[in-house]
Amino acid sequence: MIKIIPLLENTTTSSQYRCKHGLSLYIETPNHKILFDLGPNDLFLKNAKKLGVRIQDIDTVVISHGHVDHCGGLGAFLKSNSIAKIYLRSQAVDKHYVKVFGIPFYAGINAKLVKGDRFVFTDEVSVIDDEITLFSNVQGGCKLPKADGNLFVKEDGRIIPDDFSHEQNLIVSSDGTKTLFCGCSHAGIVNIVDKAAQVVGCVPQTIVGGFHLFEPTTKRYEKDEYITMIANELKNRDADYYTCHCTGPMAYETMKKQGLRLGYLSTGAVCKLYE
């Protein structure tokens, strides 16, 4: 069994849990206690306490990419946990920006915190052990979200379009199952699923994460035609899907109407797979 508890997501199952734009998933496997992303601040810690999740027992952290809504809670985590290995792409510590009405705002990680041997920079494919595989550098033919165009990185003093080389994805292998976890799917959720299938030899039975169909700074969704196309492409890759965060509730409903086997994970939900 794999247990998933969103410690922080844009929405909440109850007023007792705080929510904010961002993502932090607690993943419990037979051999690991994993945090997939750390949200924008320390709210995931407060929710974890209410949900009975002991942050000090986390043994593995995966930072999906270097945007603040996924790694802003790093400082708070480091104060609460002294044992976990923290896996990220080396490019995650680059200076990342989001443009709002053409004006760039810093939206990256606090790079000063990334030091010491508990931080591990990952390769294009990194097999950590029998349960955990990380992969990045996703390419593919499926059109990318338009909202990617608002995201940038500073290189040699210039702000240039983000190539998302800092984005990585997690595959958990357990009892003959494969579960794919994505943060924001900037490389395109369809392309990510296809690369996961290349890495592990099959389409994962379950796919969990944000699909980047909603742009938070402008409050705009991708066009319905694009959302419908993504839903139909995912249907062709037979799996169960759980989404959250940057997909947005309207896009979620649109995809559900296409017949995609899709659930939504809000802060405080408890999802048990393969019972």
Label the predicted regions:
Residues M1-S15, D148-P161, H212-E222:
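Glycine-rich phosphate-binding "P-loop"
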Residues I2-L51, D163, E167-F181:
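Conserved beta-strand hairpin/beta-sheet module of binuclear metal-dependent hydrolase folds
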Residues I27, D37, A48, H65, ...:
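Divalent metal-coordination and catalytic microenvironments
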Residues H32-I34, T60, I132, K178-T179, ...:
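Structural motif
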Residues G39-D42, H67-V68, H186-G188:
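Short beta->alpha connector loops
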Residues L43-D94, Q198-T206:
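Active-site metal-binding motif and surrounding structural segment of the metallo-beta-lactamase
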Residues H70, D163-N169, S173-T267:
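Cap/insert and terminal regions of metallo-dependent hydrolase folds
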Residues A92-Q168, M255, G263-Y274:
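Metallo-beta-lactamase
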